[in-house]
């Protein structure tokens, strides 16, 4: 497994293929959001034997604060522990290099397994955001704080 800098083509390929869970597929209302994820040195892609496995990164919101994101291919299940560790290390590295003191994520409420994932990343639950999604689904706000 190797990590490479994220490219728009990686995200598009992941979305066109089978995802690890279809709940991971963004709502069509978001349109082509992939270019907004492109921030130099703030995203990466995991590749195994030439296959895209996952991509993750942090979208900067304002100074010191970013929003974490993740896209996993259907083959992520074969590498779930390795991917989890790589994503945690990668997000923490990005946060440190970019001087972020808050990294947050919005995780679907109807996908309870994501709470375990967020805890593994070192995040704490901050609350439920009702009708947050473009499709009016509820989301949970999770965040990692450094020095606050």
Please provide the spans of the model-predicted regions:
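Conserved acetyl-CoA-binding loop-helix of GNAT-fold acetyltransferases
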Residues: 79-95, 116, 120
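C-terminal "cap" of GNAT-fold acetyltransferases
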Residues: 68, 131-148
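Conserved beta-strand in the GNAT
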Residues: 45, 51-60, 66-69
